[in-house]
């Protein structure tokens, strides 16, 4: 699936506004194994994140964090898909997932993170995404962020440890303007159009891309719309301000999967 030949359209910003696009790479992130959980883990197997933290929302420096409600999927020894029985309750740099099922036949298992709207190894990249405040990627989980990993059993702790490899592509938008008139405007929507299909359902395939894994499938849509407005009554109900004369993520940084 090609994700790099985008034609960018800004629906709510005049063409004279400066726009800097930064591509965040889908790099491997290390994971930290200091996540805590209060769930009774009897009969469950721990799949832990190692060091330093790996996650599912992205900071401006490319680091990721797990978010509330994130879950992973693993096939057990009987070949049945199992979803983690617990999930983070808030933003955290690390977490210990507890998996139902039996995991004694092998020393390593494939781990799948299909996003919050995905299922098993099926990922849905949303054609309509919403970011309610500047410089946050808390919407990534419902927009199509995803990843796979190989979890390997630790001989000492007997827990499975893994490093999540994110497989989606990300766009970072940094709009600014030197036009005083436009400083009274707000960024409310960004539209990205590609000559390839970039939305709909894809499969996390750990054997693709010479064994490193990849999203496979053809998709079914060529446009993604990112709405950049908060809820009514919130600070950003009118959109993100365009008061900056140079790129400033804190003012109006926007992110798209």
Where are these predicted regions, by residue range?
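Sec-type signal peptide cleavage vicinity
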Residues: 2-257
């Amino acid at each position: 699936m090609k994700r790099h030949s985008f034609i960018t359209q800004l629906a709510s910003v005049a063409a004279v506004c400066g726009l800097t696009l930064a591509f965040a790479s889908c790099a491997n992130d290390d994971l930290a194994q200091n996540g805590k959980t209060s769930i009774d883990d009897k009969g469950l197997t721990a799949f832990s994140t190692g060091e330093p933290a790996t996650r599912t929302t992205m900071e401006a420096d490319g680091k990721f964090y797990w978010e509330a409600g994130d879950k992973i999927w693993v096939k057990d020894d009987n070949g049945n898909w199992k979803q983690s029985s617990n999930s983070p309750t808030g933003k955290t740099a690390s977490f210990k997932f507890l998996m139902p099922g039996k995991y004694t036949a092998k020393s390593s298992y494939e781990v799948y993170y299909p996003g919050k709207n995905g299922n098993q190894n099926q990922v849905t990249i949303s054609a309509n995404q919403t970011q309610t405040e500047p410089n946050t990627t808390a919407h990534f989980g419902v927009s199509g962020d995803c990843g796979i990993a190989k979890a390997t059993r630790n001989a000492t702790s007997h827990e499975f440890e893994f490093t999540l490899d994110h497989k989606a592509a990300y766009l970072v938008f940094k709009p600014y303007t030197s036009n005083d008139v436009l400083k009274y405007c707000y960024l409310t929507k960004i539209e990205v159009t590609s000559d390839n299909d970039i939305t709909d359902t894809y499969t996390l395939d750990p054997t693709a891309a010479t064994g490193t894994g990849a999203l496979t499938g053809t998709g079914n849509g060529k446009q993604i719309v990112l709405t950049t407005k908060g809820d009514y009554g919130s600070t950003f109900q009118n959109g993100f301000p365009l008061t900056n004369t140079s790129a400033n993520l804190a003012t109006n940084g926007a992110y798209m999967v």
